[in-house]
Each structure stands twice: as C-alpha cells, then as structure tokens.
Curated annotation (Swiss-Prot):
This is Hexon protein p72. It comes from African swine fever virus (isolate Tick/Malawi/Lil 20-1/1983) (ASFV). Keywords: Capsid protein, Host cytoplasm, Host endoplasmic reticulum, Host membrane, Host-virus interaction, Late protein, Membrane, Viral attachment to host cell, Virion, Virus entry into host cell. Transmembrane segments: none annotated. Pfam families: Capsid_NCLDV. It comes from the Viruses. One of its GO terms (cellular component) is host cell cytosol. InterPro entries: MCP_C (IPR007542), MCP_C_sf (IPR038519), VP_dsDNA_II (IPR016112). It is a peripheral membrane protein. The lineage of its organism: Viruses, Varidnaviria, Bamfordvirae, Nucleocytoviricota, Pokkesviricetes. Induction: Expressed in the late phase of the viral replicative cycle. Belongs to the NCLDV major capsid protein family. One of its GO terms (biological process) is virion attachment to host cell.
Length: 646
C-alpha cells in the first residue's frame, strides 16, 4: 500500500482573510489559554474546543445535550357526539391520556358510490340536462338543433368509450362518477377547538387549501395527495424513436459538422465534429456500424439519436368511473399545537371533558359529481362524395341518482406525549403562559366593477402575514359543470380543449392536375382539456388609518415574488396565480420567534382594495383572507384562555 504524501494547508494573510479567519486572534487565544492553564498548574494546558468556539466556528465538531426522557404514541378517538354522515357535525373529546397532546389527524372512509341506471333516449327527443343545458338526440337528416336540415347527417348513441347503445333501451346506460379535487380538504368545511365552551381557534376549508398552496413542500406533495384523496399521475414511456439532431450553429445546414475543418468553401464557423460525435455516436443507432455487416445501414444527412416520449396518466378518485371504490382519507388538523411540538398542550392542565374538536362535514353534492355516460354520434357523408365522411360527438348528460355515500371509520388520531413524573409535576404546579398563532379569516362578497375596497373587520390581534385570494362565485356554483375542479382556485378557470381531428384521405384522381377531394375526419369523444386559471386581481393595496402599506402593487408581486423571497423552506410559490401573500414579518413561518407584525386591533381602519377587470354584477366573487394572528395562551386553574379576545 502506498503511503500518503505530506499535506500542507496554506492560510492566506490578505486583508479579507484576516477579517474572515482572524488567524492572529486564534493563535493569540490559544497561547493565552495555555499560559493561564499553566499558571493554574493544570497537567494539560491545551485549550478545549468549547473555548475555541467562543470566538471561532469549528465546523467539524458536533454538539449535543442530554434531553428529558420522552415518549409518544397515537391514540384513536371516536366521535363524542354527532351522527357520522355527510353534512353533519362531529365532536371529538380529547381524553386525559398522556402528559401532552400534539399532532392530530382525522381518518374517514367514504363508501363506494355509483350513479343510477337510465333509459336511452328515443331519436328526435330532447330533455333538460345537467346544469340547465338542453340535450337533443336529433333526427337523421337534421343538424344538432333538430330543426335545420343537414343532408347526410346520421345519428347514433355510444358510451364514453365508443361502444354503441340502442336508442330507447331501458336501463341502457349510467353516468360515471368522480370525486372533487382534494376531497379531504373539502370534507372539513370548518374545524374548531373549544375549551370550557370557549373557542380558542377555528379555520375553514379555504384556509386548508391556502396552506397547501403556500406551505406543503414539493417533496411531500405526493404523500399529501395520497392522504387527502387526490390522484397522482403515473409516468409512461413510448418505445425507442429515431430522431434527427440539428445544430443551428451553422445556419441553413442540418449537419455542419460534416464539413472538413480545412474546407475553404465554408462561410461561417461550425461545431467541432468530434464534439457532437461523442454525444451522438453512430453505433448507437446503426446496426452495421455495431458489427452486423450483412444489414443495410441507416443513412441520413444529419446525426441521429434514439429517444423515448414520456406521457402521464392517472386513475384515481378524480378519474370518472362507473363505480368509485371506497376512499380512505387522512386529514391533518392545523391548530398551533398540531404544527409545533414545542407548543404541545399539557393534558393535565385541562380537565377531561372540557376540550373538544368539532368538525363540520361537507355535503355529498360538494364531494362527488357525475360525468356523461352517453354521447350522441353524428356521422355525416358529403353528398356526391360517398368516400368523404365527418364524425362528431356531443354528450347526452341527464343527471342520475348517486347512492348515499356512507362514512365509516370516523376516528381522530391524537399524538400523546409522555414525560417523567418530575417533569410532569413541574407543569402541574406552574402557570403556563405561551405565545401562539391562531387563524383569523374573513370572507367578503364583492360585485363592484373595476375597483373595490373592503374593511377587514374580522381580523384582529397582531398579524404576521396574510394569504389572500379572490374566488369567483362561479367556481363553487352548482351551475358550473367543473365546480368540483374549480372550487379551490382563486381565479377564473377557462378550458383549453385540444381538438385532434383524425383525417383519412382516399385519392381517386385520374389526372395529374386533379386534387384528391375524398377526406374523412373523426373527432375524439372526450378531447384533452387543460384548465387555465386566470388571476382576476390586477393590482392590490393595503391601508391602515389612511396610510398606504402596499400601494397598487401588481398581483404577481404578491403571488410570486413575496412567497419566493420570504419564508425560506417554510413558504413556497403557489401554482395558483390568484393566491397571494402579504407579510409583515421578516421570517414568516420560519421560526417561533416573531419577526414583525401589524396590530390590527389598534389599527382598526385596516382596508384591502384591488383593481379587477373580471368582477361585476353578474361575475361576482368572494375575497378570502386568511391571517396568522399572534395571541397568548394562559393555562391555569384547569382552564385555557386567550390573553386577548378583542
């Protein structure tokens, strides 16, 4: 084995290095500590690392402290009161178990669901469909309105997958069913924490969605989606595909690297041929080059490469199906003691039977929706051109009856902490006073054109930051066919529908001058649809006592830059362009120590105003403001109260 050579660490003594490293100070301290230790007669005069770290950082020295023994486990609790059905309230009592309680997660299983059987319509009939839209099964020879003659039009019925259905058949089809996006978030309409009949904190489903948009890190989003019932896409790939490599360094030539470096005819520089040959070797796609001389080689004027296409698909609760299997949901609670173990509540400080979690559940219609199970197929041939035919589809969407969805396994998992009796007694005997952060929410309706201003009367106490969004009323309207997709989005959602029409041409010209005129086209039954969220706030302002804190800032500054700059890893920039953040703290959500606030209990003239081109008397919206408010929790005499109530 070879021995290692001598290693020499060279320390620069420039002006910047003297400030950053302070090598003279380090040497002086080591010498002084040695002299002091020798004067005390210590057998080992060398300084300790802790003494060195008083003035210098030692990156390779780890530290630890002994810690108070602690253990924890989750305890399942059933509802204390309330019928476990959708649309009702459930109240969970927090039992006297363990020394502290911290994390909480609700567990529910939504039963299987499906829509009812329906009769296939008779040709020529019309019926009022879902969302107030008239559904028509036209007669042959007429257009979609069943009134305008259209020669060559023939109509049949098919299911969403193109399989034929006989008109007039009893119990011939049924609609597909699917869940709303993030059903676990929407299931909890309101969550409240009460002690001795006093509400200490509460939040709505809007708060939960804003927390997800701003605070769930990307590397945990897949797990979060699994918990709240949101489908996760699966990646698929194609087989190997041959593609051409174009280097545009030399204009108008697809393979400039074939030019010899000594070619005097070239008019501009080009990529070195050895460089591209290393990245796209010919033997990766040419069998003859690889050693099979009996196979005809592939020849091309450009370099070639072999690649695959990547596509995504999903089959979760949001994918329409004839039968949706039972759906298990795990919903984390968002109170201050759930988020930070340092703020776990001493269980012994509040008597059993006086602390409750109350949850208002959403109704079934908010969670599950139908998708058309029947389509009208128009097949039209062009008179005089029997080889030319166009095929189009329109949905026949009549609401069915979805079975009542059961709600089982209703449990609240409570994380209980256990400590030694000595520590337990300290918390029993002493009054505890701690800084906490609670939710303050205000939802205000608006229908003013172009500009509006709202007093934030529901906000109080010191506010560190606010999540803000203007949600169109249409997003949660029963008349919106996509409300189960749009309900959590803070902007107007439009659909970009891809219409890939498949063409087939049959050439029958008998002269070179004649162009083929027999071309058929077939549209997809369910074209690919991309939802696009359009932000509806142009500029936003915040004022307090007439003083502009934010004066007509563009919405993108609050939706993209503020969450990008502030919050460290605790805040992320949301995908929703209509979700905005305004912070009065330098480090929102980063640490327990407050770093800035505005006390709106003192600054009561606290307004938010905005400019918009969307909102009007018909296109109304709701301003949603979720604020993080500082308060103080006082635990004494078997009760928990907030220091400030107004």
């Amino acid at each position: 084995m070879a021995s290692g050579g001598a290693f020499c660490l060279i320390a620069n003594d420039g002006k910047a290095d003297k400030i950053i490293l302070a090598q003279d100070l380090l040497n002086s301290r080591i010498s002084n500590i040695k002299n002091v230790n020798k004067s005390y007669g210590k057998p080992d005069p060398e300084p300790t690392l802790s003494q060195i770290e008083e003035t210098h950082m030692v990156h390779f020295n780890a530290h630890f402290k002994p810690y108070v023994p602690i253990g924890f486990e989750y305890n399942k609790v059933r509802p204390h009161t309330g019928t476990p059905t959708l649309g009702n309230k459930l109240t969970f009592g927090i039992p006297q178990y363990g020394d502290f309680f911290h994390d909480m997660v609700g567990h529910h299983v939504l039963g299987a669901c499906h829509s009812s059987w329906q009769d296939a319509p008779i040709q020529g009939s019309s019926q009022m469909g879902a969302h107030g839209q008239l559904q028509t099964f036209p007669r042959n020879g007429y257009d979609w309105d069943n009134q305008t003659p259209l020669e060559g039009a023939v109509y049949t019925l098919v299911d969403p997958f193109g399989r034929p259905i006989v008109p007039g058949t009893k119990n011939a089809y049924r609609n597909l069913v699917y869940y709303c996006e993030y059903p676990g978030e929407r299931l909890y309409e309101n969550v409240r924490f009460d002690v001795n009949g006093n509400s200490l904190d509460e939040y709505s489903s809007d708060v939960t969605t804003l927390v997800r948009k701003f605070c769930i890190p990307g590397d945990k989003m897949t797990g979060y989606k699994h918990l709240v019932g949101q489908e996760v896409s699966v990646e698929g790939t194609s087989g190997p595909l041959l593609c051409n490599i174009h280097d545009l360094h030399k204009p108008h030539q697809s393979k400039p690297i074939l030019t010899d470096e000594n070619d005097t005819q070239r008019t501009c520089t080009h990529t070195n041929p050895k460089f591209l040959s290393q990245h796209f070797p010919e033997n990766s796609h040419n069998i003859q080059t690889a050693g099979k001389q009996d196979i005809t080689p592939i020849t091309d004027t450009t370099y070639l490469d072999i690649r695959r296409n990547v596509q995504y698909s999903c089959n979760g609760p949001q994918t329409p199906k004839y039968y949706q299997p039972p759906l298990a949901l795990w919903i984390k609670l968002r109170f201050w003691f759930n988020e930070n173990v340092n703020l776990a509540i001493p269980s012994v400080s509040i008597p059993f039977g006086e602390r409750f979690i109350t949850i208002k559940l959403a109704s079934q219609k908010d969670l599950v929706n139908e998708f058309p199970g029947l389509f009208v197929r128009q097949s039209r041939f062009i008179p005089g051109r029997p080889s030319r035919r166009n095929i189009r589809f329109k949905p026949w969407f009549i609401p069915g009856v979805i079975n009542e969805i059961s709600l089982t396994n209703n449990e609240l998992y409570i994380n209980n902490l256990f400590v030694t009796p000595e520590i337990h007694n300290l918390f029993v005997k002493r009054v505890r006073f701690s800084l906490i952060r609670v939710h303050k929410t205000q939802v205000t309706h608006t229908n003013n054109n172009h500009h509006d201003e709202k007093l934030m009367s529901a906000l109080k106490w010191p506010i560190e930051y606010m999540f803000i969004g203007l949600k169109p009323t249409w997003n949660i309207s029963d008349q919106n066919p996509h409300q189960h997709r749009d309900w959590h989005k803070f902007g107007h959602v439009v659909n970009a529908i891809m219409q890939p029409t498949h063409h087939a041409e049959i050439s029958f010209q008998d002269r070179d001058t004649a162009l083929p005129d027999a071309c058929s086209s077939i549209s997809d039954i369910n074209p690919v649809t991309y939802p696009i969220t359009l932000p509806i706030i142009k500029n936003i302002s915040v004022t307090a006592h007439g003083i502009n804190l934010i004066d007509k800032f563009p919405s993108k500054f609050c939706s993209s830059y503020i969450p990008f700059h502030y919050g460290g890893n605790s805040i992320k920039t949301p995908d929703d362009p209509g979700a905005m953040m305004i912070t009065f703290a330098l480090k929102p959500r980063e640490e327990y120590q407050p770093s800035g606030h505005i006390n709106v209990s003192r600054a009561r003239e606290f307004y938010i105003s905005w400019d918009t081109d969307y909102v009007g008397s018909i296109t109304t919206a709701d301003l949603v403001v979720s604020a993080s408010a500082i308060n103080f929790l006082l635990l004494q005499n078997g009760s928990a109260v907030l220091r400030y109530s107004t």
